[in-house]
Curated annotation (Swiss-Prot):
This is Cysteine--tRNA ligase. Keywords: Aminoacyl-tRNA synthetase, ATP-binding, Cytoplasm, Ligase, Metal-binding, Nucleotide-binding, Protein biosynthesis, Zinc. The keyword Iron does not apply. One of its GO terms (biological process) is cysteinyl-tRNA aminoacylation. InterPro entries: Cys-tRNA-ligase (IPR015803), Cys-tRNA-synt_Ia_DALR (IPR015273), Cys-tRNA/MSH_ligase (IPR024909), Rossmann-like_a/b/a_fold (IPR014729), tRNA-synt_1_cat_dom (IPR032678), tRNAsynth_Ia_anticodon-bd (IPR009080). A motif ('HIGH' region) lies at residues 30-40. The gene is cysS. The keyword Cell cycle does not apply. It comes from Ignicoccus hospitalis (strain KIN4/I / DSM 18386 / JCM 14125). HAMAP family: Cys_tRNA_synth (MF_00041). Zn(2+) binds at residues 28, 205, 230, 234. It is found in: Cytoplasm. A motif ('KMSKS' region) lies at residues 263-267.
């Protein structure tokens, strides 16, 4: 039975969606005012893995991940650059899509705030009509005192602890939050019943999630720093409008990505743009590294740790490539020896360990331990030339990779004969003791991603 840690109840719970096998999941996406960084990717990859595991378990997952393309940060950034707010939003939205494609993160729906202004106005008007919101000269605000359950997600019940997002004189209470902001001179605006203006931050997610997932849904995800006030405010306005509790059944939050123990943030100047990481490392290496820690724990970034992840993944890929070669080129022998029978049984046990790990709140470190254990058996199968054990290991790895997506078979059509020729030439050079030229061929092949393994007078090669 799959168990998930629910931030709302602060405990592990059996995962029972509202309308199985359907799972409706909303994840907070980017505010597109600057480059996405590796900390953002930590959240997006984590929930992509969660989605793909749920699908592996037989659930039909609708995954909505929004794009906030109008916000104070975007307006301020446009002023800094001397361009329009839309140019800023479009530039970083396009970059975000390119990065998500590389990381193989594909939500079902990617709604943008500016495409849902009418829906947002309708949501705000409903809250005003029901007495949960009030209109002032500066905008429309949610009356937090009218909602008795405020603080249920974060556990922050003391009003003195409630944050004031911005100082506005005409609010009833300092902790009331904006649903609609009247535009100041030079700011973008849309017509509304109250004033020319734009949506507040929190109302956007409530509106878009309910539009695509309904008045009540299964999973809401995001980074831990969104718990308060963003997710707290989402709950307040959504439960006030729809009259349902809980509005979302399971709240899941990813841990911080840190640098030398400090949270990655602009204020600390330790941001690492995701595009820079992907210039140096394959997307699969980034996915592997991000999933090497449990999604709720902190993960400390360093280039050295990514290099370690690259080396680890390279070793695993080499084994997987060899297993694929054996399964494609060799044939089953029919009769198994004692080791093969035992090994195939071990693979089935390892498969169960993988599912047990992922069923325990998506414990990816333990799931990866199961994959590595299977690949150790795979290496033995390669040494023994066992087609049957190779197949058993490969089938399990392919199954696990539906979640992790790092072992995609790489196509090298037409290059094998040329590599074989170079390896043969190098062997001749070694026989002639032309070590310098032989080493030159090895180094050049290595640069091209081809690893040579000298075994006495014989040489084998693999794609790295």
């Amino acid at each position: 039975m799959l168990k998930v840690f629910n931030t709302l109840t602060r405990r592990l719970e059996d995962f029972k969606p509202l309308e199985p096998p359907l799972v409706r999941m909303y994840v907070c996406g980017p505010t597109v005012y600057d480059h996405s960084h590796i900390g953002h990717a930590r959240t997006w990859v984590a929930f992509d893995i969660i989605k793909k595991y749920l699908r592996l378990k037989g659930y039909n997952v609708i995954h909505v991940q929004n794009i906030t393309d109008i916000d104070d940060k975007i307006i301020n950034r446009a002023r800094e650059l001397g361009v329009s707010w839309k140019e800023v939003a479009d530039t970083y939205t396009n970059e975000y899509f390119e990065l998500m494609k590389k990381l193989k993160v594909f939500p079902t729906v990617h709604p943008r705030v500016t495409d849902h202004i009418d829906d947002i106005i309708e949501f705000v008007q409903d809250l005003v009509d029901k007495g949960y919101a009030y209109v002032t000269q500066s905008g429309v605000y949610f009356d937090v005192d009218k909602y008795p359950y405020y603080g249920q997600l974060s556990g922050i019940k003391d009003k003195k602890m409630w944050s004031q997002e911005e100082f506005v004189k005409d609010k009833k209470n300092p902790y009331d939050f904006a649903l609609w902001k009247c535009a100041k001179p030079g700011e973008p605006w849309w017509d509304s019943p109250w004033c020319k203006g734009r949506p507040g931050w929190h109302i956007e997610c409530s509106t878009m999630s309910s539009k695509y997932l309904g008045k009540q849904f299964d999973v809401h995800g995001g980074a831990r720093d969104l718990i308060f006030p963003h997710h707290e405010n989402e709950i307040a306005q959504s439960e006030a409008r729809f009259g349902v509790r809980p509005w979302v059944k399971y709240w899941l939050h990813s841990g911080y990505l840190t640098v030398k123990g400090e949270k990655m943030s602009k204020s600390l100047g330790n941001i690492v743009p995701l595009k820079d990481v992907l210039k140096s490392f394959e997307p699969e290496v980034v996915r592997y590294w991000l999933s090497s820690a449990h999604y709720r724990t902190e993960l400390d970034f360093s280039w050295e740790r990514l290099e370690e992840a690259k080396r680890s993944l390279t070793r695993m890929r080499m084994t997987v490539d060899e297993l694929r070669k054996i399964v494609k080129k060799e044939s089953p022998k029919g009769k198994l020896d004692e080791w093969e029978i035992k090994a195939i049984y071990e693979v089935s046990k390892i498969r169960n360990e993988f599912y047990d790990a992922m069923d325990n709140d998506f414990n990816t470190p333990e799931a990866w331990a199961a994959v590595r254990e299977a690949l150790r058996l795979g290496n033995k199968a390669i040494e023994e030339g066992s087609w049957e054990v190779s197949l058993a290991v490969l089938e399990f790895v392919n199954e696990a990779d539906k979640v992790f997506e790092v072992f995609e078979e790489r196509v090298h059509e037409g290059v094998e004969p040329f590599i074989d020729l170079l390896v043969e030439v190098r062997s001749k050079l070694r026989e002639m003791k032309q070590w310098e030229l032989a080493d030159y061929i090895r180094s050049k092949l290595d640069e091209l991603g081809v690893k040579l393994l000298d075994k006495g007078k014989e040489t084998e090669w693999r794609f790295a």
